[in-house]
Amino acid sequence: MSYPQGYLYQAPGSLALYSCPAYGASALAAPRSEELARSASGSAFSPYPGSAAFTAQAATGFGSPLQYSADAAAAAAGFPSYMGAPYDAHTTGMTGAISYHPYGSAAYPYQLNDPAYRKNATRDATATLKAWLNEHRKNPYPTKGEKIMLAIITKMTLTQVSTWFANARRRLKKENKMTWAPRNKSEDEDEDEGDATRSKDESPDKAQEGTETSAEDEGISLHVDSLTDHSCSAESDGEKLPCRAGDPLCESGSECKDKYDDLEDDEDDDEEGERGLAPPKPVTSSPLTGLEAPLLSPPPEAAPRGGRKTPQGSRTSPGAPPPASKPKLWSLAEIATSDLKQPSLGPGCGPPGLPAAAAPASTGAPPGGSPYPASPLLGRPLYYTSPFYGNYTNYGNLNAALQGQGLLRYNSAAAAPGEALHTAPKAASDAGKAGAHPLESHYRSPGGGYEPKKDASEGCTVVGGGVQPYL
């Protein structure tokens, strides 16, 4: 049995008097024999509490102070193994078996979080590290196993060893004594190469190599930027819109940004003549997210040929609708979100999965076509819980209800951003007859004339089997 951490070795004579942490004052004051401190069996290898000597002593009871007999062997055997060890530290069986040193236990001598480790490196520890460094001047990067080995030898932690080697390499670089080729940082040297002044004090040829590699990296990054700037395909979040109709490639981001700033200045004058240019990324002024912004622009089939005034209530950017002629490279967001089910929807109908934040824009939709292409939300079952779909109690597949019953009705009275779409079967029609919605806007129809003012709070129905009550 090894000594506990921080246990100082004392002479066997003083052990019996002072360093018995397992006993109270009454046990120490009990009479004991002189042979007890010298017994050969009261060591870490003393019998366990199941032995005959222990049970004989336990029969007397442990409520009173321990009773010691004149027999040294029986008295030493009467203690458990964790109590008998402090009395005899130097038995013949233990010499050399367990060596005690003040920096760790014998079972696991290398402990990272051991508080007994020294906090600063001594001269002999650094001498060991310097010897290893002199032997490996061509490659002064110790591996993980070598660091652990050096940490065990020098009684240092792994972080101390890694920091010492990092400082040693930095010191050699400053003295222009680099005899190794600089290499990239690996997972072993995450803490070693942390400083930003890596090639600052190197020799001129090493500094030249560093500038060449940085120039190559910069060229690669510029090439990647040019590829991303000149691609007309949509980004992963679907924010990029189609570019000019005649150009096969998009403009760079800075040019589009400058032109977009000009568009904001004189949008009222040049709105009908600038529809060939669309902003690179819509700046949303409504509570719509960036994912819904490209969906607000009508698909190419539903886009009117003539100029149409952009409504002030639902616009997300001052840009005009997409060009009339479809360019070669079309936006992938439009292609991915378009669907063949779109002509079956009536005027002003949106997908059922429309969030509550998009309700102000959906109420002012153009009557000529669907403002939202039929998204993949229609193709999967939608389950509505009570905060979002209050009075719809079927909790079934809305797509089957749309196609089989020919029914889709919204109550847009919940147009506030904090509310959701509630669809009461009778309350929707009653609210539609009550009055016009305040967010309603006029739109120019594709034919050129205005349709009569349609109540925005009136539910929109799919053209099909007629209006039928909910299931």
From Swiss-Prot:
<feature type="region of interest" description="Disordered">
    <location>
        <begin position="176"/>
        <end position="373"/>
    </location>
</feature>
<feature type="compositionally biased region" description="Basic and acidic residues">
    <location>
        <begin position="195"/>
        <end position="209"/>
    </location>
</feature>
<feature type="DNA-binding region" description="Homeobox; TALE-type">
    <location>
        <begin position="112"/>
        <end position="175"/>
    </location>
</feature>
<feature type="region of interest" description="Disordered">
    <location>
        <begin position="424"/>
        <end position="471"/>
    </location>
</feature>
<protein>
    <recommendedName>
        <fullName>Iroquois-class homeodomain protein IRX-2</fullName>
    </recommendedName>
</protein>
<dbReference type="GO" id="GO:0000981">
    <property type="term" value="F:DNA-binding transcription factor activity, RNA polymerase II-specific"/>
</dbReference>
<dbReference type="GO" id="GO:0072272">
    <property type="term" value="P:proximal/distal pattern formation involved in metanephric nephron development"/>
</dbReference>
<keyword id="KW-0539">Nucleus</keyword>
<dbReference type="InterPro" id="IPR009057">
    <property type="entry name" value="Homeodomain-like_sf"/>
</dbReference>
<dbReference type="GO" id="GO:0000978">
    <property type="term" value="F:RNA polymerase II cis-regulatory region sequence-specific DNA binding"/>
</dbReference>
<dbReference type="GO" id="GO:0072086">
    <property type="term" value="P:specification of loop of Henle identity"/>
</dbReference>
<dbReference type="InterPro" id="IPR008422">
    <property type="entry name" value="KN_HD"/>
</dbReference>
<keyword id="KW-0371">Homeobox</keyword>
<dbReference type="GO" id="GO:0030182">
    <property type="term" value="P:neuron differentiation"/>
</dbReference>
<feature type="compositionally biased region" description="Gly residues">
    <location>
        <begin position="462"/>
        <end position="471"/>
    </location>
</feature>
<dbReference type="GO" id="GO:0001227">
    <property type="term" value="F:DNA-binding transcription repressor activity, RNA polymerase II-specific"/>
</dbReference>
<keyword id="KW-0238">DNA-binding</keyword>
<dbReference type="InterPro" id="IPR003893">
    <property type="entry name" value="Iroquois_homeo"/>
</dbReference>
<dbReference type="GO" id="GO:0000785">
    <property type="term" value="C:chromatin"/>
</dbReference>
<feature type="modified residue" description="Phosphoserine">
    <location>
        <position position="186"/>
    </location>
</feature>
<dbReference type="GO" id="GO:0043565">
    <property type="term" value="F:sequence-specific DNA binding"/>
</dbReference>
<comment type="similarity">
    <text>Belongs to the TALE/IRO homeobox family.</text>
</comment>
<feature type="compositionally biased region" description="Low complexity">
    <location>
        <begin position="355"/>
        <end position="367"/>
    </location>
</feature>
<dbReference type="GO" id="GO:0000122">
    <property type="term" value="P:negative regulation of transcription by RNA polymerase II"/>
</dbReference>
<dbReference type="GO" id="GO:0048468">
    <property type="term" value="P:cell development"/>
</dbReference>
<dbReference type="GO" id="GO:0005634">
    <property type="term" value="C:nucleus"/>
</dbReference>
<dbReference type="GO" id="GO:0006357">
    <property type="term" value="P:regulation of transcription by RNA polymerase II"/>
</dbReference>
<dbReference type="InterPro" id="IPR001356">
    <property type="entry name" value="HD"/>
</dbReference>
<feature type="compositionally biased region" description="Acidic residues">
    <location>
        <begin position="261"/>
        <end position="273"/>
    </location>
</feature>
<keyword id="KW-0597">Phosphoprotein</keyword>
<dbReference type="InterPro" id="IPR017970">
    <property type="entry name" value="Homeobox_CS"/>
</dbReference>
<dbReference type="Pfam" id="PF05920">
    <property type="entry name" value="Homeobox_KN"/>
</dbReference>
